[in-house]
């Protein structure tokens, strides 16, 4: 994050750490790119190659679109403070949410077996669960979920505004701590194995 102080007002303003002009290549090995978004309504589409892990912290409701990314294996949204942000074009990546108390949106998941990791998400309060939308525009193509949860209070949904998601028929959950995972109504109707 870039922190700038306005000389006229003395106000601090943070700016996004990535934009659509960025071209990054991680090369060999396992690489992690950490992104902070600060401007609401921003849609950044960076070109990423050989970067396996993408971590995003939303300070405002914006979109990081990975349509020009290759080799991404895990997308993690963590420690966000602003309105629900969206990570689009996640393809076959594992989707992870950590230390999060605001909603998260993903889009464009093509994984048939979707790995979901939730660590210290939401709270036990009556309205403490956060919503994780697995397909804001294009529904998730997962036919099964593999969920790892630790102290997670999550409501899963798929808005699927343009393209319907696949029919999910099974889910596995490995849980530690206290958890509450609520599936989307459409998934509850079709999951046969839990």
Q: What residue spans do the PLM features occupy?
A:
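Solvent-exposed, low-complexity segments and loops of surface/extracellular structural proteins
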Residues: 1-194
């Amino acid at each position: 994050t870039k922190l700038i102080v306005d000389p006229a007002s003395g106000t601090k303003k943070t700016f996004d750490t990535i934009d659509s002009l960025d071209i990054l290549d991680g090369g060999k090995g396992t690489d992690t790119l950490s992104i902070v978004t600060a401007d609401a309504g921003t849609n950044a589409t960076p070109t990423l190659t050989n970067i396996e892990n993408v971590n995003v912290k939303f300070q405002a409701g914006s979109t990081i679109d990975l349509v020009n990314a290759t080799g991404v294996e895990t997308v993690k949204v963590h420690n966000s403070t602003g309105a629900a942000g969206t990570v689009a074009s996640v393809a076959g990546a594992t989707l992870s949410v950590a230390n999060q108390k605001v909603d998260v949106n993903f889009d464009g998941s093509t994984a048939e077996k979707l790995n979901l990791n939730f660590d210290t998400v939401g709270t036990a309060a009556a309205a403490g669960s956060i919503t994780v939308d697995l397909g804001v525009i294009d529904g998730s193509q997962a036919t099964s979920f593999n969920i790892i949860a630790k102290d997670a209070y999550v409501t899963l949904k798929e808005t699927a505004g343009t393209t319907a998601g696949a029919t999910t028929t099974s889910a596995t959950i490995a849980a530690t701590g206290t958890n509450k995972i609520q599936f989307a109504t459409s998934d509850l109707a079709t999951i046969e194995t839990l």
